[in-house]
Amino acid sequence: MKKILILSLAMLLGITAANADALTGGVSTVGLGNKVVDANTNAPISGAQISLPKQNYSTKSDENGNFNLNANFSGNTIMSVKKDGYKPFSLTIDEHIAARPMILGIQKSNGREVVIESAMLHLGDNNFSAGSANSDQFKLKAIGPFYTKTFKMSANTLNLNNYLVIGSIIGIDTAMARSMGQNSVRNSFSSPPEVYFNGTKIAEIQLNGDNQKIKLPNNLIRADNTNEVTIQTGKNLTQHAYVDYDDIELMNLSIQSE
């Protein structure tokens, strides 16, 4: 019997924002080998690109949607799945998940997505302890404590529900993340990363996780004009001698309208 592991805990608990909810999609651990399928029809998807950015590893699904992960890693790492005509998808996996057959369900695009960033981003100051969430997986240099990107949104988005979707995020060291066993930092914790839309704070991200959706208030949208999203990492709340930014990594940022 299929055992579907819906990755919803971080999506349900990890965001403090009005009307935040969970994105459908998940991973199953049944069958022989790994497979990429259409999330709605379960039809196999060929030619999907599956990558582990930190391991510099990439492969594609065959005509039956099957693929192998011939990469060695330990601890959490982000796996990305890309296919033309489908929404960006990423998943945090470890060696235990990778050791079992996976079925990855990805969703067809509705043509209204705006891809903000598909590459891996490292925010912070490159100063983190071994107990920090996923610190053993940090391989990129930090670009600084925040990331900002501008983009355009059409006037018809005002009649839709619009979301900033974060494909995957790791490294958050909040008190909530610690209570959920996502890090082993004993004597300190950080404030949550903050999300700003057109200069207004709209959310805090409390937990590490995948496919987190943050509602964009329609009254803040600049229709047919330039809009701006900023993600700012948190700060160590027990360090008062200097500013110690929490180091986090994230991937696959997009605007999705429904």
Predicted features, each with a name:
Residues 26-29, 42, 92-258:
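Beta-strand-rich recognition domains
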Residues 30-32, 39-54:
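Short, ordered, surface-exposed loop/turn motifs in non-cytosolic proteins
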Residues 4-13:
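Sec-dependent N-terminal signal peptides
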Residues 18-31:
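Beta-strand-rich domain onsets/edges
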Residues 48-52, 65, 79, 195:
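Hydrophobic beta-strand segments
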Residues 76, 80-100:
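A short, solvent-exposed loop/turn motif at the edges and junctions
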Residues 55-68:
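Short, acidic Ser/Thr/Gly-rich low-complexity loop/linker segments typical of extracellular
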Residues 37, 82-84, 232-236:
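Beta-strand-rich extracellular modules
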